Amino acid sequence: MAITKDDILEAVANMSVMEVVELVEAMEEKFGVSAAAVAVAGPAGDAGAAGEEQTEFDVVLTGAGDNKVAAIKAVRGATGLGLKEAKSAVESAPFTLKEGVSKEEAETLANELKEAGIEVEVK
């Protein structure tokens, strides 16, 4: 019996974040591709939409800085990730630590991580 797309989607839905990251890395190696997002230009026009303030932000770890151990500890403390997940996140930068958080929460997390010497972006 052949595996269907639904079977694959169900298997991925039951994976942890780290398992999905490992799956993506394995697929990149197997097929010689990159899973990096392609930048797409937004629709032209509507000047009113450009004035709207962003309400949800992503906190992205862009670099571990000089002290990798301190970076892993800071990521664990700030996100609640386990040791293995935090280590993988630090080593695979850029890595999105939090998605869809408020501006205040994103800035607080970013400042906490920057104090530990980690390079962080709020998008």
UniProtKB/Swiss-Prot annotation:
Disulfide bonds: none annotated. It comes from the Bacteria. One of its GO terms (cellular component) is cytosolic large ribosomal subunit. InterPro entries: Ribosomal_bL12, Ribosomal_bL12_C, Ribosomal_bL12_C/ClpS-like, Ribosomal_bL12_oligo, Ribosomal_bL12_oligo_N_sf. Keywords: Ribonucleoprotein, Ribosomal protein. One of its GO terms (biological process) is translation. GO terms for molecular function: mRNA binding; structural constituent of ribosome. Signal peptide: none annotated. Forms part of the ribosomal stalk which helps the ribosome interact with GTP-bound translation factors. Is thus essential for accurate translation. Belongs to the bacterial ribosomal protein bL12 family. This is Large ribosomal subunit protein bL12.
